[in-house]
Amino acid sequence: MNNQPSVLFVCVGNGGKSQMAAALAKKHAGDALKVYSAGTKPGTKLNQQSLDSIAEVGADMSQGFPKGIDQELIKRVDRVVILGAEAQLEMPIDANGILQRWVTDEPSERGIEGMERMRLVRDDIDARVQNLVAELTQNA
């Protein structure tokens, strides 16, 4: 039996925040954590500013692509993290894991745009990811 903890990061388009969280989790956890990402309404490509901001901190999401929700995966993972307030997801009744929502910083509400905005979003997600990785891997 595989006791490796697992997490699924979810946002609407799976082109930005959930991909960023997955890349950061892989960077911090390495092989100690199985990491997945998906979107409730997947887009067609990754957000270029997300890619660039993740690369700045030594993580890589360049091989990612927007994907939809896999109901079987949701049932198996230890944690499902919804990023932002927009994505809506209900856990299947027979799911094993815990659902949580991260209402992430949205600098555009303060008039901050472009790469400055994306770096702030990345740093907020990164702090949350580091805490989650520590929590999920402490007993693995």
UniProtKB/Swiss-Prot annotation:
<dbReference type="Pfam" id="PF01451">
    <property type="entry name" value="LMWPc"/>
</dbReference>
<dbReference type="InterPro" id="IPR023485">
    <property type="entry name" value="Ptyr_pPase"/>
</dbReference>
<keyword id="KW-0059">Arsenical resistance</keyword>
<keyword id="KW-0963">Cytoplasm</keyword>
<protein>
    <recommendedName>
        <fullName>Arsenate-mycothiol transferase ArsC1</fullName>
        <ecNumber>2.8.4.2</ecNumber>
    </recommendedName>
</protein>
<keyword id="KW-0808">Transferase</keyword>
<dbReference type="InterPro" id="IPR036196">
    <property type="entry name" value="Ptyr_pPase_sf"/>
</dbReference>
<dbReference type="GO" id="GO:0102100">
    <property type="term" value="F:mycothiol-arsenate ligase activity"/>
</dbReference>
<comment type="function">
    <text>Involved in defense against toxic arsenate. Involved in the mycothiol/myoredoxin redox pathway which uses a mycothioltransferase mechanism; facilitates adduct formation between arsenate and mycothiol.</text>
</comment>
<comment type="similarity">
    <text>Belongs to the low molecular weight phosphotyrosine protein phosphatase family.</text>
</comment>
<dbReference type="GO" id="GO:0046685">
    <property type="term" value="P:response to arsenic-containing substance"/>
</dbReference>
<dbReference type="GO" id="GO:0005737">
    <property type="term" value="C:cytoplasm"/>
</dbReference>
